[in-house]
Amino acid sequence: MKSSELFNRAKTLMPGGVSSPVRAIKPYPFYVERAAGSHLTTVDGADLIDCCLGYGPLILGHAHPEVREAIERQLEKGWLYGTPTPLELDLAGIITGDHPAVEMVRFVSSGSEATMAAIRLARGYTGKQDIIKIEGGFHGAHDAVLVKAGSGATTLGVPDSAGVLADLTAHTRQVPYNDTEALEALLAGNDDVAAFILEPVMGNVGPVLPDDGYLADVREITAAHDVLLILDEVITGYRAGIGGAEVLYDVKPDLATFGKIIGGGLPIGAFGGRCDIMELVAPAGPVYQAGTFSGNPASLAAGYATLRHLHDHPEIYRRLDDATRAIGEAAADAGKGTFVRIGSLFKHFFRDAAPRDYREVKECDTEAFSRFWKAMLEAGIFLPPSQFETNFLSAAHTTQDIKQIAEAYGSCLFA
């Protein structure tokens, strides 16, 4: 069956015909038959260079041999036990070793679950009720953070979701990104704030980069007010380099959350931080968290193989940085909009200057982006289909892939 036929069938079986809203490309999404390296093959026979990469987890590309072999070895031994496994220690050891602020870690099944648990833990540790998030910051699809949320929520025009209780979101405050004065003012009038959760780089509407010194100032301000700092590294973890944004920007949070890359393309999440905080998590303490699939062996195997490969080949990060720089140079030569990148994350904003916060991102010309996205797809390049999502590269993207992406940029920006 062709993509259009599959989608017509899907709409009779699933809300909107998809399992996640961002996949509902108009007039219908393309369906993927297989993927390898940096390429996708659709059921319609199209071959596409993939700059979505499952929205970030696949930093080594699709079906990387070492990751595939690790999964296959684990599947031969079983894929769900309901008991601890040695693989938990392997992956936990790498994560805690790479992140100075993460002394202990708990595995869960998604990034959303990780941020949900981290917020609960912060409230349990401090005895306070309120949390602060960034306007447009996206921390998953759970109720406490579906307030002025980015990512697909902004794409669909529903940053504040129906069905979320006002009594709950009354305890979720927001400040603009890159605005320490707003943070200071909010904290000065509220002594019931448990935590400030933020993406160190706004990956779900961007990337939108922190001003020089912003994260250091945030750390100083939160510490002065006895507010826990939660770094959401679900996107930046192992994307920004070994040690993520914590190491890149030299900022030490109280708690951090992870997902995507640490599972090598299989479902996973994790939250971690200081021992005195983490030891409140059940069964060691009174903050309850549990899950049937937490620490799933197949996900742990894929994640460990991925992180081990990144450690063995640190040159991957330099090569990916060079690749996004080359694409950015082509975009600059075209002279339309603004190209922003950090490592293997990149995005073209249809506005005159790089945005500093969510409000400026929303000023982008989304119709121009839509024309650009369609032209890139016709040129054989799949980008996330929203002005409010980040593009990704992987170690599997070849020199020819990068050349093709850069050349397409030059013409497609004027679609």
From Swiss-Prot:
Cofactor: pyridoxal 5'-phosphate
Catalyzed chemical reaction(s): (S)-4-amino-5-oxopentanoate = 5-aminolevulinate
Location in the cell: Cytoplasm
PROSITE patterns: AA_TRANSFER_CLASS_3 (PS00600)
One Pfam family hit: Aminotran_3
EC number: 5.4.3.8
Record's protein name: Glutamate-1-semialdehyde 2,1-aminomutase
Modified residue annotations for N6-(pyridoxal phosphate)lysine: 260
GO cellular component: cytoplasm
Gene, per the UniProt record: hemL
Alphabetical UniProt keywords: Cytoplasm, Isomerase, Porphyrin biosynthesis, Pyridoxal phosphate
GO molecular function: glutamate-1-semialdehyde 2,1-aminomutase activity; pyridoxal phosphate binding; transaminase activity
Biological source species: Methanoculleus marisnigri (strain ATCC 35101 / DSM 1498 / JR1)
Gene Ontology BP, a term: protoporphyrinogen IX biosynthetic process
Pathway, per record: Porphyrin-containing compound metabolism; protoporphyrin-IX biosynthesis; 5-aminolevulinate from L-glutamyl-tRNA(Glu): step 2/2
This protein's record includes keyword Glycosyltransferase: no
Family: Belongs to the class-III pyridoxal-phosphate-dependent aminotransferase family. HemL subfamily.
